[in-house]
Design a protein with these regions (language model features):
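Hydrophobic alpha-helical segments at protein termini of multi-pass membrane proteins
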Residues: 1-4, 8, 13, 48, ...
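Basic, amphipathic N-terminal segments that precede the first structured/catalytic domain
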Residues: 1-30, 92, 97
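Short glycine-rich phosphate-binding loop at a beta-alpha junction
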Residues: 23, 98-107
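Acidic, metal-ligating active-site segments
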Residues: 24-25, 31-57
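Short acidic, S/G/P-rich loop/turn micro-motifs used as interaction or catalytic elements
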Residues: 29-32, 52, 75-76, 108-114
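A short acidic (Asp/Glu
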Residues: 33-37, 111-119, 145
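Acidic helix/loop or adjacent segment enriched in Glu/Asp that either coordinates divalent metal
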Residues: 63-96
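Short, low-complexity, polybasic intrinsically disordered segments
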Residues: 105-140
Length: 145
């Protein structure tokens, strides 16, 4: 699976105008391999050039064991997404300081969805770790990469 080249992403962002907007998001999918459950975590960085032109998307998929016991309330997997997004934000922080940045979480606050079980925890974690108020579904388009 392809890994993000952080230096390449930073160089691309630095070459853009200050009006360029950055969106960082993530998603995951759970699936079985044999008797064990795994999750593919997709991380995305969308660089919206000048905030009005085209965009360049950088992405990475990480596969890990999924230890969640409740498929319909995937707290551990969803928080793992959030931790990975915060880590990615911090890797890019030095080139993001003077730019408009949004963090998009694949979490739906509607209680009909399993992801609603972590809304407050996830939003609080991103606010505390990144000093950014994250977007959640349905406004979190970068979390649907």
């Amino acid at each position: 699976m392809k890994k993000l080249d952080i230096d390449e992403v930073k160089a691309f962002i630095e070459a853009q105008s200050p009006e360029t907007k950055i969106y960082i998001g993530g998603d995951s999918e759970r699936f079985p391999i044999g008797n064990d459950w795994y999750a593919d975590y997709t991380l995305a960085i969308v660089v919206h050039i000048d905030g009005k032109h085209g965009a360049k998307v950088f992405g990475e998929v990480q596969r890990e064991r999924d230890w969640d016991q409740k498929k319909n309330r995937p707290r551990m997997r969803l928080m793992n997404e959030v931790y990975k997004i915060a880590e990615l934000y911090h890797k890019l922080h030095d080139v993001l300081e003077d730019r408009q940045v949004e963090i998009h979480l694949d979490i739906n606050p509607d209680e009909r969805y399993g992801s609603s079980c972590v809304v407050q925890e996830a939003v609080g974690y991103i606010r505390g770790m990144c000093n950014v108020v994250p977007m959640v579904k349905p406004r979190a388009f970068a979390a649907s990469y």
